[in-house]
């Protein structure tokens, strides 16, 4: 068993995910940080290791891959890493009427915000439950509570994350694992510029 505390953060190369990673590092956590921006995630790992004297494992990965969660867990097992904190932060955003939006953009959002979040919670939640402790934080949004034209796919997926997390809390709490959903308002993170898949 590895005695070090490890946290896994998705979408950690910029924005809120980067801030989560740096905050966790400041609290002494070693990190597994994941992004689909290869150069940025490597630089993030270097900066975090230099600034906080912790270990940061950068992983370049497309999280919409059906086996992404399993691949990440296998990486952790291969490197004797037990994830104590999981932050499902990776996301995309676009503002466009659904009838004028390319199918691929819709699919990426559905995959990343629904399937990936569910699979990550399923795979790492089971691993945490087996050990009897762990914490999962899922990034929802204030838009989960409202209907807005132009972001109907986005707010629907964030509603899924919110309700999924609420239900998961009841399933995992007796097993020693806590689940939280965060619903922030608009944050200027550059996400608009990253959403053009």
What are these regions (language model features)?
Residues 27-43:
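Conserved glycine-rich Rossmann-like NAD(P)H-binding loop of the short-chain dehydrogenase/reductase
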Residues 89-94:
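Conserved NAD(P)H cofactor-binding loop of Rossmann-fold oxidoreductase domains
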Residues 97-98, 105-110:
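Substrate-binding pocket helix/loop in short-chain dehydrogenase/reductase
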Residues 163, 169-197:
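SDR active-site lid
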Residues 141:
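Residue(s) in the substrate-gating loop at a strand-loop-helix junction
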Residues 121, 157:
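Active-site helix of classical SDR
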Residues 6, 13-15:
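Conserved glycine-rich cofactor-binding loop
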């Amino acid at each position: 068993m590895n005695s070090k505390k490890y946290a896994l953060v998705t979408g950690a190369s910029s924005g809120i995910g980067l801030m989560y990673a740096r905050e966790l590092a400041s609290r002494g956590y070693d990190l597994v940080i994941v992004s689909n921006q290869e150069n940025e995630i490597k630089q993030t790992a270097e900066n975090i290791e230099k600034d906080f004297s912790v270990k940061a494992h950068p992983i370049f990965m497309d999280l919409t891959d059906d086996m992404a969660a399993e691949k990440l867990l296998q990486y952790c097992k291969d490197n004797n890493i037990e994830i104590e904190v999981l932050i499902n932060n990776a996301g995309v955003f676009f503002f466009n009427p659904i009838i004028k939006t390319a199918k691929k953009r819709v699919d990426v959002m559905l995959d990343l915000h629904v399937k990936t979040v569910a699979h990550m919670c399923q795979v790492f939640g089971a691993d945490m439950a087996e050990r009897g402790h762990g914490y999962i934080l899922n990034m929802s949004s204030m838009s989960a509570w409202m209907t807005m034209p132009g972001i109907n796919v986005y707010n629907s997926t964030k509603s899924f994350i919110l309700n999924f997390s609420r239900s998961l809390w009841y399933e995992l709490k007796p097993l020693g694992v806590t689940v939280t959903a965060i619903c922030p308002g608009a944050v200027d993170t550059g996400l608009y510029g990253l959403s053009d898949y």
